[in-house]
Amino acid sequence: MTNIRKTHPLTKIINNSFIDLPAPSNISAWWNFGSLLGICLILQILTGLFLAMHYSSDTTTAFSSVTHICRDVNYGWIIRYMHANGASMFFICLFMHVGRGLYYGSYMFPETWNIGIILLLAVMATAFMGYVLPWGQMSFWGATVITNLLSAIPYIGTNLVEWIWGGFSVDKATLTRFFAFHFILPFIVSALAAVHLLFLHETGSNNPSGIPSDSDKIPFHPYYTIKDILGALLLILTLMVLVLFSPDLLGDPDNYTPANPLNTPPHIKPEWYFLFAYAILRSIPNKLGGVLALAFSILILAVVPLLHTSKQRSMMFRPLSQCLFWLLVADLLTLTWIGGQPVEHPFITIGQLASILYFTILLVFMPVISIIENNLLKW
């Protein structure tokens, strides 16, 4: 009798995705982040669900309801901090996952890559709306500043912003709809993640060498299941150390002050994982220009496959491209630092230079260096 695992319509899908899936024999720890993102998503949905049971999406009670969760609900504090810091872990894994894709040429699977970009945008939207829900000072002013950027769109801008707000300022209607969207989006992300996997399993995984691995495949279970479990344990350990020892390390103190439309905080800034994009936005003195640069800072990922000029897929055997990649990482860290600094003399210039460098590396240096490396192969 054939194993039910391989014949039953439901278990067959799981079997073909996580058990008998043929996987390259040489994929490194950089391939762990996909499963870690899945764990992050499940964790966020579960903790978020329990938070939603006690949260009130009304401007008069939102801040108090979050305080109530932390003080009065059984283990509410740990659920709240796991959710807040879980978002940070989610983005760390996301950035590593995208970085891996750029380094090893995984963007050569166009469907998987493009759905990945849509996933990134959806998770960013979810995180932004989640940050508004506690209704602290940074929640309110962050929502005001970021939604206001849409007013830079010619002709329809102002109407669009007022439509999103549900009034003439960020108020009760805005908070209620943000809660509704924040609740539904993770489930849309889950569906997109399933499609992401579906397209990945059409082609099979890439591997560090960038060379087709059809001649040397191993079953996913037990080799990569045990590897993923190790990754998951490290992820949960890191998260719990953050939650239990310094839960407010990555947060903003201003968010412990209830939202006040009459008092603007001295430095309005988003959560740390948006600072690189925020720095790019601020580095352009023109409003529409800044908004376009902000959008393109993420959408540029869609252009990367079109600019792949190298004869090799991966950067494993391309030292010049490797140097450029790590320069890009350093540049993004610089932008993250600048995004959290006030708009003053040295920081403005550093931010502008870092923004120019970011786009130049991806649009100019990468393709040019790849062509140079192709010519070096002839020597």
Curated annotation (Swiss-Prot):
Annotated transmembrane regions: 33-53, 77-98, 113-133, 178-198, 226-246, 288-308, 320-340, 347-367
Keyword Lipid biosynthesis: no
Example of a GO cellular component annotation carried by this entry: respiratory chain complex III
Gene Ontology biological process: mitochondrial electron transport, ubiquinol to cytochrome c
Subcellular localization: Mitochondrion inner membrane
Bilayer disposition of the protein: Multi-pass membrane protein
One Pfam family, short name: Cytochrome_B
Binding, heme b b566: 97, 196
CDD domains associated with the record: cytochrome_b_C, Cytochrome_b_N
Binding-site positions, a ubiquinone: 201
Cofactor annotation comment: Binds 2 heme b groups non-covalently.
UniProtKB keywords: Electron transport, Heme, Iron, Membrane, Metal-binding, Mitochondrion, Mitochondrion inner membrane, Respiratory chain, Transmembrane, Transmembrane helix, Transport, Ubiquinone
Iron-sulfur recorded as keyword: no
Cofactor(s) listed in the protein's UniProt record: heme b
Residues at which heme b b562 binds: 83, 182
InterPro entries, per database record: Cyt_b/b6_C, Cyt_b/b6_C_sf, Cyt_b/b6_N, Cytb/b6-like_sf, Cytochrome_b, Cytochrome_b_C_euk/bac, Cytochrome_b_N_euk/bac, Di-haem_cyt_TM
GO MF annotation list: metal ion binding; ubiquinol-cytochrome-c reductase activity
Assembly and oligomerization: The cytochrome bc1 complex contains 11 subunits: 3 respiratory subunits (MT-CYB, CYC1 and UQCRFS1), 2 core proteins (UQCRC1 and UQCRC2) and 6 low-molecular weight proteins (UQCRH/QCR6, UQCRB/QCR7, UQCRQ/QCR8, UQCR10/QCR9, UQCR11/QCR10 and a cleavage product of UQCRFS1). This cytochrome bc1 complex then forms a dimer.
Family: Belongs to the cytochrome b family.
Function according to Swiss-Prot or TrEMBL: Component of the ubiquinol-cytochrome c reductase complex (complex III or cytochrome b-c1 complex) that is part of the mitochondrial respiratory chain. The b-c1 complex mediates electron transfer from ubiquinol to cytochrome c. Contributes to the generation of a proton gradient across the mitochondrial membrane that is then used for ATP synthesis.
Additional remarks: Heme 1 (or BL or b562) is low-potential and absorbs at about 562 nm, and heme 2 (or BH or b566) is high-potential and absorbs at about 566 nm.
Protein name: Cytochrome b
Organism of provenance: Melogale moschata
Lineage: Eukaryota, Metazoa, Chordata, Craniata, Vertebrata
